[in-house]
Amino acid sequence: MSAITEAGSSKFIDVTEGEINGSIHVNDAGNGDEVVVMFHGSGPGASGWSNFHRNVDAFVDAGYRVLLIDSPGFNKSYPIVTKSRDGAYAQAAKGVMDKLGIKRAHMIGNSMGGATAMRMAVDYPEMVGKLVMMGGGSVGGSTTTPMPTEGLKLLQGLYRNPSMENLRKMLDIFVYAPSTLTEELINGRFENMMRRPEHLTNFVESLKASGGRANYAHLLPTLTMPTMIIWGRDDRFVPLDLGLRMLWGMPDAELHVFSKCGHWAQWEHADKFNQLVLNFLAR
């Protein structure tokens, strides 16, 4: 069994692609011929490792090479203010793949990372094998829940007023069972958030510059790659009806819903998630 560490898999790749011109941090693990790229969400202090540390070993053990990309403006990647957001994050991923000589990979994205994965499928379909999106994908507003949701309000409030108190408020509704969040995880997230204050202010500026998240709902019928949509029934950040919209719109999609699950399916139900997605990729 693998024992991948953050430090042992860490590398930096200089990327010049579109509006991206800087150093992108990547955790690169495994040496399989098939590659899986994982994209993190948008919460303050988010990183590829913090989002997917419960998943990377299982995928490497199954024979995949795994890339956890810190999107520009997050964690160890270079700071940026971007108007296109998803477009810039996809450009960064393309640049990383090009530098590493990877022509095609499966894309897995959580929340904002789901929108990044979808943007990869829109802009660079030839580089995308299968697509997996959890609690995200950027297909407009909910028809069942007032927007922005309580979770997104807390997230944006944390960016504007970063503190341990506000972080705990957000994390309390981030997962179904907040008692499962360890002090080590919470403290690590706080330290990561406060280590790069420029990322926090830049994210707020990017929100203003972009005018909100893009809506790819009209493009769903063109995304023909096999797709698995995964949602938490109890997600208080991105409502489940958006997953249903994606299911209805994409030609080759399936939806799996975890009960007793919030916005972090790959962490809250890691073992089941790993097996579900590995089975999907192996078909």
Curated annotation (Swiss-Prot):
Pathway given in the UniProt record: Aromatic compound metabolism; 3-phenylpropanoate degradation
Gene3D superfamilies: alpha/beta hydrolase
Domain AB hydrolase-1: 35-269
SUPFAM superfamilies membership: alpha/beta-Hydrolases
Active-site residues annotated for this sequence: 263
GO annotation, cellular component aspect: cytoplasm; membrane
GO term, biological process aspect, one: 3-phenylpropionate catabolic process
Entry-linked Pfam families: Abhydrolase_1 (PF00561)
Annotated site (Catalytic role in ketonization of the dienol substrate (substrate destabilization)): 189
Keyword field: Aromatic hydrocarbons catabolism, Hydrolase
Lineage: superkingdom: Bacteria
Enzyme class: hydrolase
EC number: 3.7.1.14
Keyword Magnesium assigned: no
GO MF annotation: an example: protein homodimerization activity
Catalysed reactions, as listed in the record: (2Z,4E)-2-hydroxy-6-oxonona-2,4-dienedioate + H2O = (2Z)-2-hydroxypenta-2,4-dienoate + succinate + H(+); (2Z,4E,7E)-2-hydroxy-6-oxonona-2,4,7-trienedioate + H2O = (2Z)-2-hydroxypenta-2,4-dienoate + fumarate + H(+)
Keyword Hydrolase in annotation: yes
Residues the UniProt record annotates as site (Transition state stabilizer): 111
Subunit structure: Homodimer.
Family (UniProt): Belongs to the AB hydrolase superfamily. MhpC family.
HAMAP family: MhpC
Protein's job: Catalyzes the cleavage of the C5-C6 bond of 2-hydroxy-6-oxononadienedioate and 2-hydroxy-6-oxononatrienedioate, a dienol ring fission product of the bacterial meta-cleavage pathway for degradation of phenylpropionic acid.
Protein name from the UniProt record: 2-hydroxy-6-oxononadienedioate/2-hydroxy-6-oxononatrienedioate hydrolase
